[in-house]
Design a protein with these regions (language model features):
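Glycine-rich beta-strand-centered segment in the early N-terminal region that forms part
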Residues: 20-32, 42-80, 110-115
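NAD(P)H dinucleotide-binding glycine-rich loop of Rossmann-like/cofactor-binding domains
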Residues: 71-145
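Mid-domain Rossmann-like dinucleotide-binding core that forms the NAD(H)/NADP(H) cofactor-binding site
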Residues: 116-187
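N-terminal glycine-rich cofactor-binding segment
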Residues: 3-20, 33-58, 81-97
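Glycine-rich cofactor phosphate-binding loops and adjacent beta1-alpha1 units
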Residues: 176-236
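Rossmann-fold dehydrogenase core element
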Residues: 214, 226-263
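Residues in the short beta-alpha loop(s) of Rossmann-like NAD(P)-binding domains
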Residues: 171, 221, 245
Length: 292
């Protein structure tokens, strides 16, 4: 089968791999979304790695599914405290290989309803992550930093729970979409919560947070952005990190997904993987999805 495999330098190349064997159900991949975390791993991950975890697929019996690529134990001290993504078992991948392949094996599959379009399963994992993270921050006036694909999911989730949402993004076309989804796009002085959905923007968030406010880090901040913790100290801010999701949030995402306005997708075949990565890096594609 074909797959996008990282070479000795951590760079992607299209290669032929044996059909996956071992534990789990055999899944034929219909589509796999490109996540920012995938792009971050390029040039760094080990040789032979196949990335991709935002997956829409179909089982041998014809059932459509998405998959959970990491699962916590659910019983350890960290899991019981609500920090499932820091569980020791969470580090183990539950799919082999990754989603940028024609097939994979997965130990944890989540059924998808027929009401979803065939490729919409790629949105379940990111939406589940948004739902879990949103549950960890208080309600109020929320600044969403970044109105890209993930930011647009955030806006809709927050508006549905009754929050006033302000969107911040340098691209006018993305702000226009954010406005249509119910967010304010005029700049504001203070907010109760700031959600960082893309690298960069942390200083803009810290400036706008009111005393006692909450900063939710939902994307890895850029390493070269100079940031001071002075605002955290002086305004007594709360800083929360959140990544990944639990089975309960996957199920909730499956139910919620058909009611959302999904971001625009650029669909490419696997043999145009590098092109898709560059479109993502330049901000020319809101969401890149690859099909085998």
């Amino acid at each position: 089968m074909r797959a996008v495999v990282l070479d000795a330098d951590g760079l992607p190349e299209l290669a032929d791999l044996p059909e996956p064997s071992g534990a789990g159900l055999l899944v034929r991949v219909l589509a796999c979304g490109l996540c920012g975390s995938d792009v971050e791993k390029l040039g760094h991950a080990a040789r032979g790695t196949v990335l991709g975890h935002e997956i829409a697929g179909v089982l041998e019996n014809g059932a459509r599914v998405t998959v959970m690529h990491r699962v916590s134990c659910g019983t350890c001290e960290r899991c019981l405290a609500g920090h499932q993504s820091t569980c020791g078992e969470f580090r183990e991948l539950r799919i082999a290989p990754g989603g940028f392949a024609e097939q994979l094996r997965a130990t944890h599959c989540v059924p998808l309803p027929d009401t979803l379009e065939e490729l919409d399963g790629v949105w379940v994992e990111p939406l589940a992550c948004v739902l879990r993270a949103a549950a960890s921050v208080p309600r109020g006036r929320v600044l969403v930093v970044g109105a890209g694909a993930i930011g647009q999911l955030w806006i809709q989730v927050l508006r549905r729970r009754g929050d006033d949402v302000v969107a911040l993004d340098p691209r006018p076309e993305r702000l226009a979409t954010a406005h249509l989804l119910g967010a304010e796009t005029a700049d504001v002085d203070t907010v109760a919560v700031a959600v960082l959905t893309a690298p960069g923007g942390i200083n803009a968030a810290l400036r706008r947070l009111e005393p006692g406010g909450t900063l939710l880090v939902f994307a890895a901040p850029e390493e070269d952005v100079p940031t001071t913790l002075d605002a955290v100290y002086r305004k007594e801010l709360h800083v929360v990190g959140s990544r990944s999701a639990t089975p309960a949030y996957f199920r909730e995402a499956v139910e919620l997904l058909p009611t959302l306005v999904l971001p625009e997708v650029t669909t490419l075949p696997l043999d145009r993987f590098l092109e898709g990565v560059e479109l993502y890096r330049r901000g020319e594609a809101l969401k890149v999805v690859f099909t085998p």
